[in-house]
Amino acid sequence: MSHDSVPSPITARAGTPLRGRLRPPGDKSISHRAMILGLLSLGETRVEGLLEGDDVLRTAAAARALGAGIDRDGPGRWRVRGVGIGGLSDPEGVLDFGNAGTGSRLMMGVVGGQPVTATFDGDASLRKRPMRRILDPLVQMGAQILSEQAGGRVPLTLRGPEEAIPITYATPVASAQVKSAVLLAGLNAPGTTTVIEAAATRDHTERMLRLFGAEVTVAAHGPAGHGRAIALTGQPTLRAAEVIVPADPSSAAFPIVAALIVPGSDVVIEGVMMNPLRTGLITTLIEMGADIARLNERDEGGETVADLRVRASRLAGVTVPPERAPAMIDEYPVLAVAAAFAEGTTRMQGLHELRVKESDRLAAVADGLRANGVAHAVEGDDLIVHGDGRPAPGGGTVATHLDHRIAMAFLVMGLAAGEPVTVDDGAMIATSYPAFLADLRGLGAAFAE
């Protein structure tokens, strides 16, 4: 999405039950990492099922600018010819990541650990997002910040060292992006780089580093073993790999909740990744009474995947503990929508990280609920939604603030609300789920553009 795109409003309205099957797009986290590790490996990495949304395509463009050879062989099928650790080239222009927070932050880890200089930029939303949490450990590892905006925001220029300094770093927030940036920088460090996190976050970087040949160990850490200590042996020779990208559970969240709240619905969502550090939403919905059956569990590309049969259900309010947040941080907007249709109160605790996503997601969700007549409150970093078991009133227009997940969440609300729901701009949905409207229309959803 360009910095000055014309808004594209979309309206969703209630209609017939949702029926049928769909496969959500490839996982965004794994797709980003496949491009980045393909760049840093020797040989030709082949990727099947890549998410071809704008975010991942920006990461692919950045990898190409840093020296990778990248070809698309067909839908979701890509080849990446890497340059190896230490083989990157200075890009000729700015690395424009659009809306891609994950891609920009992980690539800062790559640049910040290697002898290369690059300027990072993005759209209006990305320019508001904090990068200091990424830059601080990279500076400890030898990176130099040549220019930056207030608060360490993009556009910024980063220069990496000849060799990174191996460090032990305790992440100040539960963030897979911070952890991953440090580990990626540590690939060019002579020694062991260790990241300590107080709560386990999604572990795709660790899994994929091993797939490409790095030595990574993970040990329980801290009180009751809830945290993790991840140690990477630096300066390995990464070898090209075959990557099969499973369906993204964060994208699957939208048809899952739609099927639960639209009366009479019965939908099968195929090939969804069941990594336990990504299934917090499914766990929570089942606690609320959701009829979700896991079928045909199997292994794809080192991850457990399953087909999910989801049937319309009466939901009840629950309390979602803060320690579950890392396993569902991107799913709270659509969980809030489910809570609006539930009987009773749902309290989502410890949502401070939502304030620094593509938008201030906590405020954006609250505003969207208010616009559609849903009783709710924000208490500190907690979101409380009061439902009465009936459809949300709807009838409002939601400001998306260039946030794809806000847009999709409230379009899902509109499919079951008493009155249609409009989002002021749906263009950014393409960053993570380009076929969202088409997929849900295939199940019977009614959208007007």
Swiss-Prot record:
The active site is at residue 330. Its main location: cytoplasm. Residues 1-29 are annotated as: Disordered. It catalyses: 3-phosphoshikimate + phosphoenolpyruvate = 5-O-(1-carboxyvinyl)-3-phosphoshikimate + phosphate. Pathway: Metabolic intermediate biosynthesis; chorismate biosynthesis; chorismate from D-erythrose 4-phosphate and phosphoenolpyruvate: step 6/7. InterPro entries: Enolpyruvate_Tfrase_dom (IPR001986), Enolpyruvate_Tfrase_sf (IPR036968), EPSP_synthase (IPR006264), EPSP_synthase_CS (IPR023193), RNA3'P_cycl/enolpyr_Trfase_a/b (IPR013792). One of its GO terms (molecular function) is 3-phosphoshikimate 1-carboxyvinyltransferase activity. 3-phosphoshikimate binds at residues 28-29, 33, 175, 177, 330, 357. Keywords: Amino-acid biosynthesis, Aromatic amino acid biosynthesis, Cytoplasm, Transferase. It is an enzyme of class 2 (transferase). Its EC number is 2.5.1.19. The keyword Membrane does not apply. The keyword Ribosomal protein does not apply. One of its GO terms (biological process) is chorismate biosynthetic process. It holds the Pfam family EPSP_synthase. Belongs to the EPSP synthase family. Catalyzes the transfer of the enolpyruvyl moiety of phosphoenolpyruvate (PEP) to the 5-hydroxyl of shikimate-3-phosphate (S3P) to produce enolpyruvyl shikimate-3-phosphate and inorganic phosphate. Monomer. NCBIfam families: aroA. This is 3-phosphoshikimate 1-carboxyvinyltransferase.
